[in-house]
Each structure stands twice: as structure tokens, then as C-alpha cells.
């Protein structure tokens, strides 16, 4: 047990403490009576309470040299108050009492006190503090009750009796019932006389429980029943009384102290107006700007009332002050209040010490507490920090506190209970963790201290009200000190909260999951081959001196776009003598080789060097296409955040993105307004050149994207998708086809013409013919050619394009080039160096960049497709480079890995069945899906056609045949189309014409409601990929922003004892070390993972996904299913009001939950029929546990 504080045993002249005639007493404000003094004949005190108030009392008791005794329920056996006492005893035995009932077991508590030689019992507040019978039992047992006499508690603890007392003393009261009210009919009679609004209050007890404001007849009966039920549960007595409810009053209370000789003093007032559900949230002492005459009348009336009943010990007289500064007596609380701390701070008086010493027989004068000696100095403000979630109606949160760091410093006082790391917060008790009291010489200084202290707290593992308190304390009305009792309910902007980011703990949750379960990144095979620090290259100038790359280069082709616009840019590109390079390393290269898995942190790490080395590049292909959804889906990154960061780091090179025409970056057509919205935001965020294509070369589809980019004022690079072999007269797509297509595209006024050879089947001789023919027809039109090096002829083809008149060609850094990626930039530069087509890049700088990527590729080795060389067979199967590696992975996942050759052949078959279509995302996916379908079902081409009416084709195949991807050149294949679609529609125009515009404002509101905030970029992401976006946001809510985590630790756990760093933002670094992974808990299926964070040990509980446990947890309500009703909080079901099959209306009560002394009605979210009721009265539930379903009528 905690050892009490002991003063040195020294000779003391007791007379100096008890002789109230000594002159020096008049010069002393507050004396302490030691336990061995003539008055303090008592040695041991028991506190009949829990949480922070016993700790507060124990501290003073130790200062008075008293021995201390704590009591606790079984559920409270790990609570801090038990450890702060010299002795601690459990109330009864396990299961004998409910968690709250244990602290209401008066006989058992008295029995414990007698058994262990207790002399004084302090009741604290709540529980038995206002129970006169308990006080009588204490005194009857020969002990001293630290509080008023039982008779006083009877007369004042009953608010109706206190009201009658006020009337006799000519103290103004609010109109209300003359006596206790037990029946609904009595309440109804009062409203018939006085009207609404009214307030129903528990006659015994406080803290806002058993209290309801009723504003209309419809809510009267239910409010009466809830108030009486809460009062009975909290105080053991359901009696209530009724008063007229005052609108926007202030709540002012006066701290009183009385002794056994009829002396009463006040310790001035507190302003407790800031309340929620009649529970005080923030208190101020003294009241700011209360008129002096009003203050004097309130203080005088408070003392008058106390003296009229010979009040003994500490108590509080409470008043309401209306907007005309008229005051009305409410009640006297015959106990110490939660907020007594602020009075102590401004008066310097220890109220608890005074309580104990008065109970021992001291007079106020002996304690130096005469009214003329009591004054205030400065201001004090108290906040109650609770485990409540303000964003969910302040529903109490439960769980384990993982991190607890307190505030401190000058003028900060903390009175805590169960606020410590490792504490288990249960639904059984009050949700308060700690009281934070700050004092200052002025109200504003005190307010600023509280705000600072709140920001200083770090509490993780449970939700807290700290963000709300910070918002409240910063509101102009609070700053002015003009709050009223319903200020919180009346001020919705208080709930525009900026919550704590909780970044470290969320990051630990992810790292812990990787430590226990390994990486969950789809497509990852094993751990990285490279685990060292990547060495960044140095760029040298012509004299061999290192370039300063601490800042990015600011000179490049982008400056022409920014300063002169897209048209001038196009003219400048066309006028340029050399053939420019677009570097694809940041997008298509890693898409083709590493499954699009390269993360933002690794791009930014080489960004400044890239801006210098490639300053004369046509563009960096770095965004759009598959990188957009993969960023959210697999890397858990925001693609817009990536774009913003890249743009800042590389301000000089134009950024190019891939736009799938009317699809945006999605896989099927979207309403036109979604495309326009997307392009507008992409341009705003940093994209310069939009390479717009349509997967079927459908010009109607392509036109949507082109017009959207024009509207966004971006550079339009309208693109022809190259497929087949134009030199083969048997092939579908010949030179005439491409030239006719180019004519249609040029009519749409693009700035640049793109040629997209997605499979790498553009042979050098075909390249010369195609590019040369276009150049001849359109001599002023810039041409940019994109290819893949799958067949190994990419370098030759790109050189051929340059020689035929192309203005820009694609390449990738050497170590990320070849095979399904783009041709080698080093090889192209070497081939064109010194010629009229020289790209104008520094080869040494380009090679230096490549040294970084050579290391990085090893870091991403788990995503390699293990291709070993060129595949000229691509001229037969025509699988796009970006799809080939993904198709290999998909085949292995489907169990077709051993049939890869067969899958490639099936790709040719599928392409022919679909009409030899242009193959690029999303149509390439259609062909790939059909190929795998053919292999897995062992079908021939004829089987597919003959059995089309009965086969369950992949969804992408049906969408293509339906026309949702546009119209293919030459039409759809028949009879396959009609047979496969059966009764589905057939579109003969572009799909966007059949789609209603998206309600973008509604989407934004939906995102805001679901995730707390929403930007236009969020709307754009949702429009493209609703489910992917929602899943990503939920992941981030759980694990935070993982883009800051070094890739090695994103993909694999560190070694035990290995230290590594994570830079959360500039100047904020976490120093982490994995310490241990605990054993599997058979009860929970979890393992504890221990990390050291900035030298502090933290732990997280992680579900072991490999463990087989008996999961008896209740099913959770699916928030996406409106028919499912979940519990709004953890608690106990105290009442069920429905049954299966019952028809209910929206808002009808379904059940009542009780948690932390608060009851909450679960209401029907909509009308319908109840089914699947899963709870019964007495059941314990957690937040979001499924209660029932309501099927809409």
C-alpha cells in the first residue's frame, strides 16, 4: 500500500491549535490540526467512494497525519484509489453486488470500517454522500460522518424540503411543485397550470442524473419515466420534483462551510453555467462580470439558508440567475462538490482539510476561517476530462488506456482517478479521468493555461472530450465569460472539432500488425532483398563539383506552360530541334515491373535530384491510370496528397497523367460532370499534361476527356491507342484506320497528339511509317510516342519515331527499363547523342539517378514478376506491358500459375472472340478476365459461343458487351453478344448519355458525415472509386497516415531491438524500437506487441490472424446497411420495448441502455418491421453491437 505522508514527530504545544483566544490565530488564515492534537483525537479515515475524490481526500488526510482506508468493488480492484490508501478492502465478495451497488452497500461499508478501526468516514460526492440513513448508521456505529448531520441531509438533500426552506427564509425560488412528485398525473397537472418548458429533477442526488427538460406534451411521459428510472438507479430513490424551466440562465453556486457551533462562512461563488445534460463541464471561480450587488445578494442568501438549519461542514448553495440578473435558489448540496478545487485555488483554503477538522470538532475560528479573513485572488477554471466521444453525442467510450501523459507546469493542478497507462475503462462508472484546474491572475490568463494544458495531454486507447473542451474554451462566448446553462446545446459550432491526430499510436497499431501477421499488402511475396539505407546519388557539375540539390531546380518546360499557356507550350515543343524524353519511372515503369507498388516517400526521396537531372525532359509521367486507385487500395495513400507533394518537390518538369477519356481514372464510364470535376482538380493540384485516350479508340468517348481538360486549361494530349500490326494486311487496324482516327482527333483541337503502344507491338518500321505519315499530314502538331519494351525492340522503335518526326518519346531509368517497362533512357540518349535528335539531357546525371533506382528496385523485390528477358511472343498475344505482370499474379492467385502458357494462348482466343479489340485498360482487363475464365473452365472458343447463354461470364465481359465501355471499331461480336447478355440492355451510344449527373454536393456531405471532413479531392476520389475510397478512409482512421513510414518497415517488421526513425512532419520525428512480441492469448486471440517510442515503452494488442479462437463476440451492425441497428455505446440493456415482427415508426424507442449512470434510448432509424432481435434485458453490449434489424415497410 502507498505509505502516507508523515510530518516529523516533534514536540508541539497543542494549545496553539485550540486556544481561539490567542492573538496569533487572528493573523493566520488556515490552520492544520495534527492527528495527535487535543481536538484531532482520530487516527484513521475511510472514504466511501471511488475514483479521483478518494485520492483527493487521502492526500489531505496524509497531511493531517491520518491513516487512510479505501474500499473498492470487484470491478474496481485495479483502480488507482485503492493504491493511494494505507489500507484497502473489497466491498463484499465477487458477484455479491453490482459495480455501482457495492458503493451503495451502506451496511457492508460500515462493517468494513468497524472491523478495521476507522474513526471517520468521508462520503465524497455521489453514491451515499447525500444519504441520511448512511450518515445515521455511521454515527450509530460510533464513528464520525464527515459531512452535515443526518437531519440536515434529510431537510436539504431533499430538494423539495430545501425549496420550502428557501420560501420560509424569503429567498426567491423558481415556480415549482410544492412537494415530491411520484405520479405522472401530478406532473401533467403542473404543466396544465404553468405550461412548458419544465424541468424534472431527482429529489435526491445530483450530477445531472434523473433530470430532464421537457418542452412539449408529446415528450412528457417518457421524460418522466426516464428521470424517475435514472434517479432510482443512481440514488436508490426515484422521487422527483418539477419546476418551470428558465431560458438561458447562469448557474451560480456558493461554497459554504459551517461548524458545530452555528457559524457559517462562504468561500465566494463559482460559475457553473457550462453544462451538458445538466452535468457541469467547465467551472469558473469567481464568476466573471457578475454584478457586485447580485453577487452580494446571492452570497448573503446562501449564508442565511445555511444558518437557518445550523449547517455543519461543507456544502454548496446553488442558484440560477436569469437574463435580468434576478437570482433564484435551486438547492443546497450537502456534500463536497467536484468543482471545489477552483474555490481552493482562489482562496488558498483546503476545503477537505476544513471538512475533516470540523468533523473532529474544530470551530471555524480555530481554523482561521472567519468571513473577514476569506478573500479571493485571481481566477481558476476547471475542466473535467472524460472518456466521452463528443462526435457521438458524448457517448462514453470504454477500453484500455494505451498512452497517458499528463499536463503540468505553473498554475496547473490535476486531480486524477484512473488516468494512467494500462487502466481499463469500464462502462460501470462515471467517465471522468482527471480534473484539470488552472489558476491565473486574470480570467484570460487562467483560460489560456487551461487550453495549453489540454493540448499538452496525450491520452490514447479511448476517446476523450479534450477536442471538445479545447473548442469550448476557445469560443468567443466563453472567452467573454457570457455562457449560460444550455450554451453547449445551443452552440453547434462547438462540435466542429479538430481531434488529436494520435499519429504515433496509430502507427504502432500498423507496425504491430506487421510484426504479428506479416505484411497485408496484396501481391507481396516475401520480404525485401534490400534492408540497408539507400544511398542517394550526387550530381556533379562540369567542373566535377556537387550540385546543390537541397532545393529543386526551377527552370524547365513547365515554366512555359505556367507563363504562356498550353498553346505556347505546344509550339515550343514543336519548334524544339531535339527529340524530348518523357520519363515513365514514376508511373508506368513501376506499374509494369513492380505492380504499381512504389510509394510516395521513395519518389520524394529522389525528387530534388530528378528536378535537376531531367530539367529538360518533356514531362514526368507520374500520376493517373492505375497509380490512382492502387495508391488508396494497396498503399493506403491519398493520390492527391502524393501529387501535391511531388509538385512541390519538382516545380520545373511538366507532370503528365493518364486519363481514360470518359472513364476518368476509373474502369467504366462515368457521368460527364464527374470527368470535368476530376480534371479541374487534377490541374489545380499539379497535373500539366493530360494524356487522354479511350480504350476502344471511340472518339465520342475520347471527346469527353478532351473537352474536360480544355475546360480545366490543361495541356491536351489526345491519344491514339496502337494495336495489332499495321504492316500486316490481314490485321484489322491498318494505316488508313489510324490516319482516319487522327483526323477525327485533330478536329477536337488537341495541343499534342499521343500514340500509345501499350503492348510494345509497334515495330520500328511501322513506327517510321505511322509517325512519318502523321507528320506529313500535320506538320505543326507535336507528336509524343509511348511504348513498352516487351519484345526487346523498344529502343529501336523510339529512335525510329524520333527520326520520323516525333517530338517526344518514352523511356525509363535503366534499372527500371526493359521487358514490360519502357525502353532504357540511357540507351536512347546514347543512340541520339550528338545527332539532330539529341534530347538535351546530361547522361551522367541520368546515370546518377539510376543508382538510386537500382537500390530501390531491390527494396520492392517482393513485387517482382520475375521476368527474365524480352518476350517477342507479345506480337502474337498483344498483352499490354502494364497488364502482363498483373496477369501473372492473378493467374497464380486463381491457381493457374502452372498454366501460364495456356493463359497467354487463351488471351489471343479471348481477343478474337471479342472482335479483336484495342487492348488497354479497361478493355485489356476484359480480355484477361475472359482468358482466365476460359482456362479455369477448360473452354474452347466454340464452347464460349455455343454456351454463352448459360455461362456466368465475368462482370467486366458483360459490361463490355453491354456497351458500358464504348463502341468498338467494327462493332460487337455476334451471336456472342446477344447470347451472353440475355435480357440485359445493349447500348449503341456512349454510356455517359445514359447516366445522370453525379450530385457532387451530396457526395461531399456524405463523406463529411461519414468521416468528419471532406474536400473536393475527396469527392473526386469517391466519384471514381466509392468503395475503394471508403475503405481507404477507414484504414487511415485506424492506422493513420502511413505514407511517412519508411518502405522497409511498411513491408516487413524490424528486428527485435532494431532502432528506426519515422519523420511525421518537419521537425517531428519518432524514434522507434521493437522490443518484444508477447505470447498468444487464448481468450482474445491477441498478442501484445511492445515498442519503445521516443524512449517510452508502449504496447498494442494485435489480433493474431493465424490463431484459431472461439469467437463468441456479438455481431456488429454494418454501418452501410440501414436496416441494421447497432448499440450507440457500451452498456447494459435495462429495457426492451419491441419484439420481432412489431411495426415501428421512425424514432420509436427500441431499447434502453444504461452506462456510466446514464440511460440512452435506442430509437428506430426509420419505419419498418423489427426482426432478428439479438439482445435481452440485462445483456451487456459493446458499441455498434447489432441489436436488431428494421426492414423498411
Curated annotation (Swiss-Prot):
Give the EC number: 6.4.1.1
Domain (ATP-grasp): residue spans on this chain: 163-360
Gene Ontology BP terms: gluconeogenesis
Which residues of the sequence carry a binding annotation for substrate?
587-591, 660, 921
Keywords associated with the record: ATP-binding, Biotin, Cytoplasm, Gluconeogenesis, Ligase, Metal-binding, Multifunctional enzyme, Nucleotide-binding, Pyruvate, Zinc
- Where are the N6-biotinyllysine residues found in this chain? 1157
Q: Which PANTHER family match?
A: PYRUVATE CARBOXYLASE, PYRUVATE CARBOXYLASE, MITOCHONDRIAL
Q: What is this protein called?
A: Pyruvate carboxylase
Give the species. Answer: Aspergillus terreus (strain NIH 2624 / FGSC A1156)
The upper taxonomy is: Eukaryota, Fungi, Dikarya, Ascomycota, Pezizomycotina
Amino acid at each position: 500500500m502507498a505509505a502516507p505522508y508523515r510530518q516529523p514527530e516533534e514536540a508541539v504545544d497543542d494549545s496553539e491549535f485550540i486556544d481561539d483566544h490567542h492573538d496569533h490565530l487572528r493573523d493566520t488564515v488556515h490552520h492544520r490540526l495534527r492527528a495527535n492534537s487535543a481536538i484531532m483525537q482520530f487516527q484513521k479515515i475511510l472514504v466511501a467512494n471511488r475514483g479521483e475524490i478518494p485520492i483527493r481526500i487521502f492526500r489531505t488526510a496524509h497531511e493531517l497525519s491520518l491513516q487512510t482506508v479505501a474500499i473498492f468493488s470487484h470491478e474496481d480492484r485495479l483502480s488507482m484509489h485503492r493504491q493511494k490508501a494505507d489500507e484497502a478492502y473489497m466491498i463484499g465478495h465477487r458477484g455479491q453486488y453490482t459495480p455501482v451497488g457495492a458503493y451503495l452497500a451502506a451496511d457492508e461499508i460500515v462493517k468494513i470500517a468497524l472491523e478495521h478501526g476507522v474513526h471517520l468516514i468521508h462520503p465524497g460526492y455521489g453514491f451515499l454522500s447525500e444519504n441520511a440513513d448512511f450518515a445515521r448508521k455511521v454515527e450509530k456505529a460510533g464513528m464520525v460522518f464527515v459531512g452535515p448531520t443526518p437531519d440536515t441531509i434529510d431537510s436539504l438533500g431533499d430538494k423539495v424540503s430545501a425549496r420550502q426552506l428557501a420560501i420560509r427564509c424569503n429567498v426567491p425560488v423558481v415556480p415549482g411543485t410544492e412537494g415530491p412528485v411520484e405520479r405522472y398525473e401530478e406532473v401533467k397537472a403542473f404543466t396544465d397550470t404553468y405550461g412548458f418548458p419544465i424541468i424534472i429533477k431527482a429529489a435526491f442526488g445530483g450530477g445531472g442524473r434523473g433530470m430532464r427538460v421537457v418542452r412539449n406534451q408529446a415528450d412528457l411521459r417518457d421524460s418522466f419515466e426516464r428521470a424517475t428510472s435514472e434517479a432510482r438507479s443512481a440514488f436508490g430513490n426515484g422521487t422527483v420534483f418539477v419546476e418551470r424551466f428558465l431560458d438561458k440562465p447562469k448557474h451560480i453556486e456558493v461554497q459554504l462551510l459551517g461548524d458545530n457551533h452555528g457559524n457559517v462562512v462562504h468561500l465566494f461563488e463559482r460559475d457553473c453555467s457550462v453544462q451538458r445534460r445538466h452535468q457541469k463541464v467547465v467551472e469558473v471561480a469567481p464568476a466573471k462580470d457578475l454584478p457586485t450587488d447580485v453577487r452580494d445578494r446571492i452570497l448573503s442568501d446562501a449564508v442565511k439558508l445555511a444558518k437557518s438549519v445550523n449547517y455543519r461542514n461543507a456544502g454548496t448553495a446553488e442558484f440560477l440567475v436569469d437574463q435580468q440578473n434576478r437570482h433564484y435558489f435551486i438547492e443546497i448540496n450537502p456534500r463536497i462538490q467536484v468543482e471545489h478545487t477552483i474555490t481552493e485555488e482562489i482562496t488558498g483554503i483546503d476545503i477537505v482539510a476544513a471538512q475533516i477538522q470540523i468533523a473532529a470538532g474544530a470551530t471555524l475560528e480555530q481554523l482561521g476561517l472567519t468571513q473577514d479573513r476569506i478573500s479571493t485572488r485571481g481566477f481558476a477554471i476547471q475542466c473535467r476530462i472524460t472518456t466521452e466521444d463528443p462526435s457521438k453525442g458524448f457517448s462514453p467510450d470504454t477500453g484500455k488506456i494505451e498512452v497517458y501523459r499528463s499536463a503540468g507546469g505553473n498554475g496547473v493542478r490535476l486531480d486524477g482517478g484512473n488516468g494512467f497507462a494500462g487502466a481499463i475503462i469500464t462502462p460501470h462508472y462515471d467517465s471522468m479521468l482527471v480534473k484539470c484546474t488552472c489558476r491565473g491572475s486574470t480570467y484570460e490568463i487562467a483560460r489560456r493555461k487551461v487550453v495549453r494544458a489540454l493540448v499538452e495531454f496525450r491520452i490514447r486507447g479511448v476517446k476523450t472530450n479534450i477536442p471538445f473542451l479545447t473548442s469550448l474554451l476557445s469560443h468567443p462566448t466563453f472567452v467573454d465569460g457570457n455562457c449560460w446553462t444550455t450554451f453547449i446545446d445551443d452552440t453547434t459550432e462547438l462540435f466542429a472539432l479538430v481531434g488529436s491526430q494520435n499519429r504515433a499510436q496509430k502507427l504502432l497499431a500498423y507496425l504491430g500488425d506487421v510484426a504479428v501477421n506479416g505484411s497485408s499488402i496484396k501481391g507481396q511475396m516475401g520480404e525485401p532483398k534490400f534492408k540497408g539505407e539507400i544511398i542517394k546519388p550526387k550530381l556533379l557539375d562540369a567542373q566535377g563539383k556537387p550540385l546543390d540539390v537541397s532545393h529543386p531546380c526551377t527552370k524547365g518546360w513547365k515554366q512555359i506552360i505556367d507563363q504562356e499557356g498550353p498553346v505556347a507550350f505546344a509550339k515550343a515543343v514543336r519548334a524544339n530541334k531535339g527529340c524530348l524524353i518523357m520519363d515513365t519511372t514514376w508511373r508506368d515503369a513501376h506499374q509494369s515491373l513492380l505492380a504499381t507498388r512504389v510509394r510516395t516517400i521513395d519518389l520524394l526521396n529522389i525528387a530534388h535530384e530528378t528536378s535537376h537531372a531531367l530539367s529538360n525532359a518533356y514531362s514526368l509521367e507520374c500520376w493517373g491510370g492505375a497509380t490512382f486507385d492502387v495508391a488508396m487500395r494497396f498503399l493506403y495513400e491519398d493520390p492527391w496528397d502524393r501529387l501535391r507533394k511531388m509538385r512541390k518537390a519538382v516545380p520545373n518538369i511538366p507532370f503528365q497523367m493518364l486519363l481514360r477519356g470518359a472513364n476518368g481514372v476509373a474502369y467504366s464510364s462515368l457521368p460527364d460532370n464527374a470527368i470535368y470535376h476530376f480534371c479541374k482538380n487534377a490541374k489545380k493540384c499539379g497535373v500539366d499534361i493530360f494524356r487522354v485516350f479511350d480504350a476502344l479508340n471511340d472518339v465520342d468517348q475520347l471527346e469527353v476527356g478532351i473537352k474536360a481538360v480544355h475546360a480545366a486549361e490543361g495541356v491536351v494530349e489526345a491519344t491514339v491507342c496502337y494495336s495489332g500490326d499495321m504492316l500486316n494486311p490481314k490485321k484489322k487496324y491498318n494505316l488508313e484506320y489510324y490516319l482516319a482516327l487522327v483526323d477525327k482527333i485533330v478536329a477536337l483541337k488537341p495541343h499534342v497528339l499521343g500514340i500509345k503502344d501499350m503492348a510494345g507491338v509497334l515495330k520500328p518500321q511501322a513506327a517510321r511509317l505511322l509517325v512519318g505519315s502523321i507528320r506529313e499530314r500535320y506538320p505543326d502538331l507535336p507528336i509524343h510516342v509511348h511504348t513498352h519494351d516487351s519484345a526487346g525492340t523498344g529502343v529501336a522503335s523510339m529512335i525510329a519515331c524520333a527520326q520520323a518526326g516525333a517530338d517526344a518519346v518514352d523511356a525509363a531509368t535503366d534499372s527500371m527499363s526493359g521487358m514490360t517497362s519502357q525502353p532504357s533512357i540511357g540507351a536512347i540518349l546514347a543512340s541520339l547523342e550528338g545527332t539532330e535528335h539529341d534530347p538535351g539531357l546530361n547522361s551522367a546525371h541520368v546515370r546518377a539517378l539510376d543508382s538510386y533506382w537500382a537500390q530501390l528496385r531491390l527494396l520492392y523485390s517482393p513485387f517482382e514478376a520475375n521476368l527474365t528477358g524480352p518476350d517477342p511472343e507479345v506480337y502474337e498475344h498483344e498483352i499490354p506491358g502494364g497488364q502482363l505482370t498483373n496477369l501473372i499474379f492473378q493467374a497464380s492467385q486463381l491457381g493457374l500459375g502452372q498454366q501460364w502458357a495456356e493463359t497467354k494462348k487463351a488471351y489471343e482466343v479471348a481477343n478474337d472472340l471479342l472482335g479483336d479489340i484495342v487492348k488497354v485498360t479497361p478493355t485489356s482487363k476484359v480480355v484477361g478476365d475472359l482468358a482466365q475464365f476460359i482456362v479455369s473452365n477448360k473452354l474452347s472458343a466454340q464452347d464460349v459461343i455455343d454456351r454463352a447463354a448459360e455461362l456466368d461470364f465475368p462482370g467486366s465481359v458483360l459490361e463490355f458487351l453491354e456497351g458500358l465501355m464504348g463502341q468498338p471499331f467494327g462493332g460487337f461480336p455476334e451471336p456472342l453478344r446477344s447470347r451472353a447478355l440475355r435480357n440485359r440492355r445493349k447500348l449503341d451510344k456512349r454510356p455517359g448519355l445514359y447516366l445522370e449527373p453525379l450530385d457532387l454536393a451530396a457526395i461531399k456531405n456524405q463523406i463529411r458525415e461519414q468521416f468528419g471532413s471532406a474536400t473536393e479531392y475527396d469527392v473526386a476520389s469517391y466519384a471514381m472509386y466509392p468503395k475503394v475510397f471508403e475503405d481507404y478512409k477507414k484504414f487511415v482512421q485506424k492506422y493513420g497516415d502511413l505514407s511517412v513510414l519508411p518502405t522497409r518497415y511498411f513491408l516487413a517488421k524490424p528486428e527485435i531491438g532494431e532502432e528506426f526513425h519515422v519523420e511525421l512532419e518537419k521537425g517531428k520525428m519518432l524514434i522507434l524500437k521493437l522490443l518484444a512480441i508477447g505470447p498468444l492469448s487464448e481468450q482474445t486471440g491477441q498478442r501484445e506487441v511492445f515498442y519503445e517510442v521516443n524512449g517510452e515503452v508502449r504496447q498494442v494488442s494485435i489480433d493474431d490472424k493465424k490463431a484459431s479462437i472461439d469467437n463468441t463476440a456479438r455481431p456488429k451492425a454494418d454501418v452501410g446497411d440501414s436496416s441494421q441497428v447497432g448499440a450507440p455505446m457500451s452498456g447494459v440493456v435495462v429495457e426492451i420495448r419491441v419484439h420481432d415482427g412489431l411495426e415501428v415508426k421512425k424514432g420509436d424507442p427500441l431499447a434502453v441502455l444504461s452506462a456510466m449512470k446514464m440511460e440512452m434510448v435506442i430509437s428506430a432509424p426509420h419505419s419498418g418491421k423489427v426482426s432478428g432481435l439479438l439482445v435481452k434485458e440485462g445483456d451487456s453490449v459493446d458499441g455498434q453491437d447489432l441489436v436488431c434489424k428494421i426492414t423498411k415497410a
